[in-house]
Regions:
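Conserved ABC transporter NBD signature motif
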Residues: 58-72
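Catalytic Walker B motif of ABC-type/P-loop ATPase nucleotide-binding domains
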Residues: 171-174
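Conserved ABC ATPase signature
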Residues: 146-150, 154
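A short, proline-enriched helix->beta-strand linker immediately N-terminal to the Walker B motif
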Residues: 165-169
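ABC ATPase "signature
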Residues: 230-231
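Helix N-cap at the start of a conserved alpha-helix in ABC-type nucleotide-binding domains
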Residues: 182-184
Length: 254
């Protein structure tokens, strides 16, 4: 079942056209790894999908919630459109490179903030669900600790639990291991592997080629704002058709 469809997505920052017509489909349970050099548009694409950045053109369909970015005044006062964007965002969980936990809240409060104040859940119910999520990511003992008292890996696992707390249809990961010390990377990737095994749909901007090859069922290679190569990881990694993709993977080999 298709849960995400992007057609001709474009994004510019002043005169710099970062996305030049992205087309992408993800089915339920897909793990899509998005690879490419810095500046290719990977993170911008993710941020446009959940409207952290405002696309200039294109159509985004998340589980039947369709927004035509070409015709809409996305930053305007249209209340119906803004409500539609909020509805779309509720279907998407986002995990950032820099964790983005609120430093003045303990981990439990970080996780329950959106369920209580956005979804309208009772605080007690949200806390019980949050504790289960912390157990799922292996840091239940950190529920009442503050982010500054956690390692980078623990903070990112807490951020994954926070993203899961809204029960999203799709998780978006923006280079989730890039800010971690090397010895902490595996604990985060392990959580992501478990989510993949449980059938969570994920789009992952990553430089972790082993994860992309072994966990994903689809890999896309971005270059200069366009998808230049896409397919099953076995094909992309062993027989890429794009010379740029071949060179990128050659330079990333272990």
């Amino acid at each position: 079942m298709k849960v995400l469809e992007i057609n001709q997505l474009e994004k510019s920052f002043e005169d710099n056209k970062v996305l030049k017509g992205i087309n992408l489909i993800a089915d339920k349970g897909d793990v899509v790894s998005i690879i490419g050099s810095s500046g290719s548009g990977k993170s911008t694409m993710l941020r446009c999908i959940n409207f952290l950045e405002t696309p200039n053109k294109g159509v985004i369909n998340v589980c039947g919630e369709v927004i035509d970015c070409s015709q809409a005044n996305l930053d305007g006062p249209d209340k119906e459109l803004q409500s539609q964007i909020i509805t779309l965002r509720k279907k998407l969980g986002m995990v950032f490179q820099s964790f983005n936990l609120w430093s003045h809240m303990n981990i439990l409060d970080n996780i329950t903030e959106a369920p209580v104040h956005v979804l309208g859940k009772e605080k007690e119910v949200a806390e019980q669900e949050a504790l289960k999520l912390l157990q799922q990511v292996g840091i239940e003992e950190k529920a009442y600790a503050y982010p500054a008292h956690l390692s980078g890996g623990q903070q990112q696992r807490a951020a994954i639990a926070r993203a899961l707390a809204i029960n999203p249809e799709i998780l978006l990961f923006d280079e989730p291991t890039s800010s971690l010390d090397p010895e902490l990377v595996d604990e985060v990737l392990s959580v992501m592997r478990n989510l993949a095994e449980q059938g969570m749909t994920m789009l992952v901007v990553t430089h972790e080629m082993e994860f992309a090859r072994k966990v994903s069922n689809k890999v896309i290679f971005l270059h200069d704002g366009l998808i230049e190569e896409e397919g099953h990881p076995d094909t992309v990694f062993t027989n890429p058709q794009s010379e740029r993709c071949r060179n990128f993977l050659f330079n990333r080999r272990d």
